[in-house]
Amino acid sequence: MAKGKDVRVRVILECTSCARNGGNKESRGISRYITQKNRHNTPSRLELRKFCPYCYKHTTHGEIKK
């Protein structure tokens, strides 16, 4: 039996350039991705380069709090 909290947790990644600009006028919103991470292997915040459909380019997506 597993003890303690689950090792894999669900995290939300948000586009940092959209969030920084506050969803500027030409942007329709803020891009978000849902993924999982292993808490033991990556205890720090996760940052990945993903495609943002609102910026029309690959940008850094950072982990946000729920």
Curated annotation (Swiss-Prot):
Gene Ontology cellular component terms for the protein in this record: chloroplast; ribonucleoprotein complex; ribosome
Ribonucleoprotein among keywords: yes
PROSITE patterns per the UniProt record, alphabetical: RIBOSOMAL_L33
Gene Ontology BP term (one): translation
Entry's Gene Ontology molecular function annotations: structural constituent of ribosome
The keyword GTP-binding appears for this protein: no
Pfam family for this entry, one: Ribosomal_L33
Protein name: Large ribosomal subunit protein bL33c
Organism: Ceratophyllum demersum
